Amino acid sequence: MPTINQLIAQPRKIQRSRNKVPALDACPQKRGVCTRVYTTTPKKPNSALRKVAKVRLTNGFEVIGYIPGEGHNLQEHSVVMIRGGRVKDLPGVRYHILRGVLDTQGVKNRKQRRSKYGAKRPK
């Protein structure tokens, strides 16, 4: 613990919280173009092939976005919208790709939580 004299000489530094989604530039979503669509494996103890895409955003950032839901139609040069939100078991994946927006189709046969996956209401 510092003495009073030490604090007078050098006051305490204010701890600034770092931005968890710097590529969004304080916007709720950003548009981008897929440069690579691939699968990757999660950290231990989980095991799967998670679908992700490398996206070049309109502001020049290149980020990795997670593609949620079962099945997708994304390929290289698809135009997508990303939002913030990391995937805990995929290191480096700090963004989600929005389903049912721009070139990304919604999840087929989705009955519950449809708004999260861009699925229309079943007839």
Curated annotation (Swiss-Prot):
GO (cellular component) term, any one: small ribosomal subunit
Keywords: Methylation, Ribonucleoprotein, Ribosomal protein, RNA-binding, rRNA-binding, tRNA-binding
Keyword RNA-binding: yes
Top-level taxon of the source organism: Bacteria
MF terms in GO: rRNA binding; structural constituent of ribosome; tRNA binding
Gene Ontology BP annotations: translation
InterPro entries the record matches: NA-bd_OB-fold (IPR012340), Ribosomal_uS12 (IPR006032), Ribosomal_uS12_bac (IPR005679)
Keyword Ribonucleoprotein among record annotations: yes
Complexes and interactors: Part of the 30S ribosomal subunit. Contacts proteins S8 and S17. May interact with IF1 in the 30S initiation complex.
Matching HAMAP family: Ribosomal_uS12_B
Function description: With S4 and S5 plays an important role in translational accuracy. Interacts with and stabilizes bases of the 16S rRNA that are involved in tRNA selection in the A site and with the mRNA backbone. Located at the interface of the 30S and 50S subunits, it traverses the body of the 30S subunit contacting proteins on the other side and probably holding the rRNA structure together. The combined cluster of proteins S8, S12 and S17 appears to hold together the shoulder and platform of the 30S subunit.
PANTHER family: 30S RIBOSOMAL PROTEIN S12 FAMILY MEMBER
Name used for this protein in its record: Small ribosomal subunit protein uS12
Annotated organism of origin: Methylobacterium radiotolerans (strain ATCC 27329 / DSM 1819 / JCM 2831 / NBRC 15690 / NCIMB 10815 / 0-1)
Gene that encodes the chain: rpsL
